[in-house]
Protein backbone atom coordinates (compact mmCIF):
# COMPACT_ATOMS: atom_id res chain seq x y z
CA UNK A 1 0.00 0.00 0.00
CA UNK A 2 2.87 2.36 0.75
CA UNK A 3 4.93 1.35 -2.31
CA UNK A 4 1.89 1.57 -4.57
CA UNK A 5 0.98 5.08 -3.34
CA UNK A 6 -2.32 4.35 -1.63
CA UNK A 7 -1.16 4.81 1.95
CA UNK A 8 0.28 8.24 1.13
CA UNK A 9 -3.09 9.68 0.08
CA UNK A 10 -5.18 8.02 2.80
CA UNK A 11 -6.08 9.86 6.00
CA UNK A 12 -6.33 13.39 7.32
CA UNK A 13 -4.01 16.06 5.86
CA UNK A 14 -2.57 17.07 9.25
CA UNK A 15 -1.79 13.53 10.40
CA UNK A 16 0.39 10.63 9.34
CA UNK A 17 -0.83 8.40 6.49
CA UNK A 18 -3.57 6.01 7.57
CA UNK A 19 -4.36 2.42 6.78
CA UNK A 20 -7.41 1.96 4.52
CA UNK A 21 -9.05 -0.30 7.10
CA UNK A 22 -8.62 -3.65 5.35
CA UNK A 23 -5.70 -5.47 3.73
CA UNK A 24 -6.80 -4.19 0.35
CA UNK A 25 -3.52 -4.94 -1.42
CA UNK A 26 -4.02 -8.66 -0.85
CA UNK A 27 -7.59 -8.55 -2.16
CA UNK A 28 -6.65 -6.48 -5.21
CA UNK A 29 -3.77 -8.78 -6.10
CA UNK A 30 -6.07 -11.80 -5.86
CA UNK A 31 -8.66 -10.04 -8.05
CA UNK A 32 -6.14 -9.09 -10.75
CA UNK A 33 -4.62 -12.56 -10.49
CA UNK A 34 -8.04 -14.05 -11.21
CA UNK A 35 -8.51 -11.69 -14.16
CA UNK A 36 -5.13 -12.74 -15.47
CA UNK A 37 -6.01 -16.43 -15.18
CA UNK A 38 -9.26 -15.92 -17.09
CA UNK A 39 -7.49 -13.95 -19.83
CA UNK A 40 -4.76 -16.60 -20.05
CA UNK A 41 -7.35 -19.37 -20.32
CA UNK A 42 -9.01 -17.48 -23.19
CA UNK A 43 -5.60 -17.16 -24.88
CA UNK A 44 -4.95 -20.88 -24.35
CA UNK A 45 -8.31 -21.79 -25.86
CA UNK A 46 -7.48 -19.72 -28.95
CA UNK A 47 -3.83 -20.68 -29.38
CA UNK A 48 -3.24 -23.81 -27.31
CA UNK A 49 -0.42 -22.01 -25.52
CA UNK A 50 -0.08 -21.28 -21.82
CA UNK A 51 1.80 -18.43 -20.19
CA UNK A 52 3.15 -17.17 -16.88
CA UNK A 53 1.00 -14.61 -15.03
CA UNK A 54 3.01 -12.09 -12.99
CA UNK A 55 0.95 -10.27 -10.33
CA UNK A 56 2.63 -7.91 -7.84
CA UNK A 57 0.93 -6.58 -4.72
CA UNK A 58 2.11 -3.01 -5.29
CA UNK A 59 1.13 -2.98 -8.97
CA UNK A 60 -2.35 -4.16 -8.05
CA UNK A 61 -2.61 -1.16 -5.73
CA UNK A 62 -1.10 1.12 -8.38
CA UNK A 63 -3.75 -0.01 -10.87
CA UNK A 64 -6.56 1.58 -8.81
CA UNK A 65 -4.73 4.88 -8.20
CA UNK A 66 -6.73 6.65 -10.93
CA UNK A 67 -4.72 9.52 -12.50
CA UNK A 68 -2.36 9.90 -9.52
CA UNK A 69 0.86 9.33 -11.50
CA UNK A 70 -0.38 11.00 -14.70
CA UNK A 71 -1.42 14.15 -12.79
CA UNK A 72 2.10 14.55 -11.45
CA UNK A 73 3.76 13.61 -14.73
CA UNK A 74 1.71 16.02 -16.85
CA UNK A 75 1.31 19.01 -14.53
CA UNK A 76 3.35 18.51 -11.38
CA UNK A 77 0.19 18.22 -9.30
CA UNK A 78 0.69 15.90 -6.33
CA UNK A 79 -2.48 14.50 -4.82
CA UNK A 80 -2.39 14.54 -1.02
CA UNK A 81 -4.45 13.32 1.93
CA UNK A 82 -7.82 15.06 2.18
CA UNK A 83 -9.73 13.00 4.75
CA UNK A 84 -13.40 12.43 3.99
CA UNK A 85 -13.84 15.28 1.51
CA UNK A 86 -13.35 15.66 -2.22
CA UNK A 87 -11.37 18.92 -2.50
CA UNK A 88 -13.35 21.69 -4.21
CA UNK A 89 -16.35 19.35 -4.55
CA UNK A 90 -18.98 20.39 -2.03
CA UNK A 91 -20.97 19.27 -0.27
CA UNK A 92 -19.57 15.75 -0.37
CA UNK A 93 -18.72 14.52 3.09
CA UNK A 94 -19.72 12.43 6.08
CA UNK A 95 -21.79 14.39 8.57
CA UNK A 96 -22.66 13.70 12.22
CA UNK A 97 -26.17 12.78 13.37
CA UNK A 98 -27.63 12.21 16.81
CA UNK A 99 -26.90 8.49 16.58
CA UNK A 100 -24.34 7.93 13.84
CA UNK A 101 -22.76 9.26 10.67
CA UNK A 102 -24.34 10.00 7.30
CA UNK A 103 -22.82 10.47 3.86
CA UNK A 104 -24.21 13.24 1.64
CA UNK A 105 -23.21 13.93 -1.97
CA UNK A 106 -24.98 17.14 -2.96
CA UNK A 107 -22.33 18.90 -5.00
CA UNK A 108 -24.23 19.42 -8.26
CA UNK A 109 -26.29 22.62 -8.46
CA UNK A 110 -29.77 21.03 -8.82
CA UNK A 111 -29.02 18.54 -6.06
CA UNK A 112 -27.68 21.23 -3.76
CA UNK A 113 -30.89 23.20 -4.24
CA UNK A 114 -32.90 20.14 -3.18
CA UNK A 115 -30.64 19.71 -0.17
CA UNK A 116 -31.29 23.31 0.85
CA UNK A 117 -35.03 22.69 0.53
CA UNK A 118 -34.66 19.66 2.80
CA UNK A 119 -32.80 21.84 5.29
CA UNK A 120 -35.63 24.40 5.04
CA UNK A 121 -33.04 26.96 3.98
CA UNK A 122 -33.83 27.54 0.29
CA UNK A 123 -32.07 30.92 0.29
CA UNK A 124 -28.79 29.14 0.96
CA UNK A 125 -28.83 27.92 -2.65
CA UNK A 126 -29.02 31.55 -3.80
CA UNK A 127 -26.20 32.78 -1.58
CA UNK A 128 -23.29 33.83 -3.86
CA UNK A 129 -20.90 31.83 -1.65
CA UNK A 130 -22.77 28.59 -2.39
CA UNK A 131 -24.92 29.19 -5.48
CA UNK A 132 -22.56 27.52 -7.95
CA UNK A 133 -20.36 24.46 -8.03
CA UNK A 134 -17.20 26.59 -8.14
CA UNK A 135 -18.35 28.89 -5.34
CA UNK A 136 -19.14 25.97 -3.04
CA UNK A 137 -15.69 24.55 -3.71
CA UNK A 138 -14.10 27.79 -2.57
CA UNK A 139 -16.17 27.83 0.63
CA UNK A 140 -16.16 24.11 1.33
CA UNK A 141 -15.24 24.13 5.04
CA UNK A 142 -17.79 26.81 5.90
CA UNK A 143 -20.55 24.99 4.01
CA UNK A 144 -19.69 21.68 5.68
CA UNK A 145 -20.02 23.36 9.08
CA UNK A 146 -23.49 24.67 8.16
CA UNK A 147 -24.66 21.25 7.02
CA UNK A 148 -23.14 19.48 10.04
CA UNK A 149 -24.92 21.89 12.39
CA UNK A 150 -28.19 20.83 10.76
CA UNK A 151 -27.53 17.08 10.62
CA UNK A 152 -26.65 17.01 14.33
CA UNK A 153 -30.30 17.80 15.09
CA UNK A 154 -31.55 14.63 13.36
CA UNK A 155 -31.24 10.89 13.79
CA UNK A 156 -29.85 8.81 10.94
CA UNK A 157 -33.32 7.44 10.16
CA UNK A 158 -34.86 10.92 10.11
CA UNK A 159 -32.14 12.28 7.84
CA UNK A 160 -32.31 9.28 5.52
CA UNK A 161 -36.07 9.62 5.05
CA UNK A 162 -35.85 13.37 4.52
CA UNK A 163 -33.10 13.25 1.90
CA UNK A 164 -34.74 10.33 0.12
CA UNK A 165 -37.91 12.41 -0.18
CA UNK A 166 -35.86 15.26 -1.69
CA UNK A 167 -33.86 12.98 -4.04
CA UNK A 168 -30.48 13.88 -2.55
CA UNK A 169 -27.82 11.16 -3.01
CA UNK A 170 -26.95 10.04 0.49
CA UNK A 171 -26.71 7.09 2.80
CA UNK A 172 -25.91 5.83 6.24
CA UNK A 173 -22.36 4.75 7.01
CA UNK A 174 -22.90 1.04 7.70
CA UNK A 175 -21.18 -1.29 10.13
CA UNK A 176 -21.54 -5.08 10.30
CA UNK A 177 -24.54 -4.88 12.64
CA UNK A 178 -26.36 -2.62 10.16
CA UNK A 179 -25.63 -5.01 7.30
CA UNK A 180 -27.07 -8.00 9.13
CA UNK A 181 -30.24 -6.06 9.94
CA UNK A 182 -30.82 -4.52 6.50
CA UNK A 183 -33.55 -6.20 4.39
CA UNK A 184 -31.73 -5.24 1.17
CA UNK A 185 -28.75 -7.35 2.18
CA UNK A 186 -31.09 -10.23 2.98
CA UNK A 187 -33.15 -9.91 -0.22
CA UNK A 188 -30.06 -10.04 -2.44
CA UNK A 189 -28.41 -12.71 -0.28
CA UNK A 190 -25.42 -10.42 0.09
CA UNK A 191 -24.67 -12.23 3.34
CA UNK A 192 -25.17 -15.93 4.06
CA UNK A 193 -25.01 -18.09 7.18
CA UNK A 194 -22.98 -21.29 7.38
CA UNK A 195 -22.56 -23.79 10.19
CA UNK A 196 -19.01 -23.87 11.49
CA UNK A 197 -17.98 -26.98 13.45
CA UNK A 198 -16.32 -24.88 16.14
CA UNK A 199 -18.22 -21.59 16.12
CA UNK A 200 -21.71 -22.69 15.13
CA UNK A 201 -23.71 -20.46 12.73
CA UNK A 202 -21.47 -17.78 11.17
CA UNK A 203 -22.81 -15.08 8.84
CA UNK A 204 -20.45 -13.68 6.21
CA UNK A 205 -20.45 -12.02 2.80
CA UNK A 206 -21.59 -14.18 -0.11
CA UNK A 207 -19.77 -14.77 -3.40
CA UNK A 208 -19.79 -11.94 -5.97
CA UNK A 209 -20.57 -11.17 -8.73
CA UNK A 210 -23.86 -13.01 -9.17
CA UNK A 211 -24.50 -15.21 -12.22
CA UNK A 212 -27.96 -15.94 -13.61
CA UNK A 213 -27.16 -19.42 -14.96
CA UNK A 214 -24.30 -20.59 -12.74
CA UNK A 215 -24.66 -18.86 -9.36
CA UNK A 216 -21.78 -19.32 -6.97
CA UNK A 217 -22.07 -20.30 -3.33
CA UNK A 218 -20.02 -20.84 -0.20
CA UNK A 219 -20.20 -24.60 0.21
CA UNK A 220 -18.25 -25.19 3.41
CA UNK A 221 -16.06 -23.67 6.06
CA UNK A 222 -12.32 -23.22 5.55
CA UNK A 223 -10.15 -26.26 6.33
CA UNK A 224 -9.02 -26.57 9.94
CA UNK A 225 -6.01 -28.82 9.32
CA UNK A 226 -3.45 -29.26 6.55
CA UNK A 227 -4.74 -31.79 4.04
CA UNK A 228 -8.30 -31.82 5.37
CA UNK A 229 -9.75 -31.69 1.84
CA UNK A 230 -7.13 -33.81 0.07
CA UNK A 231 -9.25 -36.96 -0.13
CA UNK A 232 -12.29 -35.07 -1.42
CA UNK A 233 -10.26 -33.26 -4.09
CA UNK A 234 -8.47 -36.39 -5.29
CA UNK A 235 -11.53 -38.62 -5.43
CA UNK A 236 -14.38 -36.28 -6.34
CA UNK A 237 -12.62 -33.72 -8.52
CA UNK A 238 -9.67 -35.60 -10.00
CA UNK A 239 -11.09 -39.12 -10.06
CA UNK A 240 -8.04 -40.59 -8.36
CA UNK A 241 -7.82 -42.74 -5.23
CA UNK A 242 -6.71 -40.93 -2.10
Regions found by a protein language model. Name each.
Residues 28-35, 106-110, 142, 154, ...:
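Conserved active-site and cofactor/substrate-binding residues in soluble primary-metabolism enzymes
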Residues 90-166, 170:
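Aromatic-enriched alpha-helical interface/lid elements that frame and gate functional surfaces
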Residues 164-185:
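Conserved PLP cofactor-binding pocket of PLP-dependent enzymes
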